[in-house]
């Protein structure tokens, strides 16, 4: 089961205040519903691939309107996909849709009602329903943090974006070939949204996975950095030894000034130690890392001049 499915499963188990639940129902119907005219009566079909969401819609219709709804199951034939669940309403359809401010007579309302837009708790419930209807969120294990809600109608999509930004979630809109999306980026904003709609357990799981993943990435970056530094140290030491051996084989180390000869002999004897450790081995007294670095640079310059002369 995907992370998005886990979130929706948690949401279907929430107990919500009666009036706030109507806002959730309005979102589910508006975003997943379709109307048809049968025998001069409007028939509403609300479709979902999630059985728990279908049961929740069915229960909300029964609880709020004592509606004689039907719960149907259809098997998708293409590509052997999941079942499709349909909540069908044949009676009092216009009355219920009018009460939810989805229709005014026979006219469809594209915007979310002012009653919902002006009430913080109802907005939260509407966003919960909107996410259950057509929301998705990436698994926190992935490298991209992304959550989106799809809408067919632009005005409705803009209202969802307004609601999200009422809670400072930095939501943005984007047109798609067959509709519009309102989306969130960033782990903190997504975690805030999950908390907002009541998916507390999913939020905690999201944060746990994100923290472990971010920590793992930090450790990997640290290891890579340490490895890069170690490789640089090894390369530098190899170059130093190569230059010292060249001096030794051409003019001998005794041709170096006494202080440089001292360093050269120690480097040949201890090729694996760091400059700091090398400085602590000087018989005449410890020298700082910068002091050792200065003498090594002089040895390298001496070797380069020898190469130029022998070329």
UniProtKB/Swiss-Prot annotation:
DNA-binding region(s) from the entry: 274-308
GO molecular function, one term: DNA binding
Stored Pfam families: HTH_WhiA (PF02650), LAGLIDADG_WhiA (PF14527), WhiA_N (PF10298)
UniProt-listed InterPro entries: Homing_endonucl, Sporu_reg_WhiA_N_dom, Sporulation_regulator_WhiA, Sporulation_regulator_WhiA_C, WhiA_LAGLIDADG_dom
GO biological process: cell division; regulation of sporulation
Highest taxon above the source species: Bacteria
Coiled-coil positions: none
Keywords: Cell cycle, Cell division, DNA-binding
Similarity field: Belongs to the WhiA family.
NCBIfam families referenced in this protein's UniProt entry, alphabetically: DNA_bind_WhiA
Known role: Involved in cell division and chromosome segregation.
Protein name: Probable cell division protein WhiA
Source species: Enterococcus faecalis (strain ATCC 700802 / V583)
The gene coding this protein: whiA
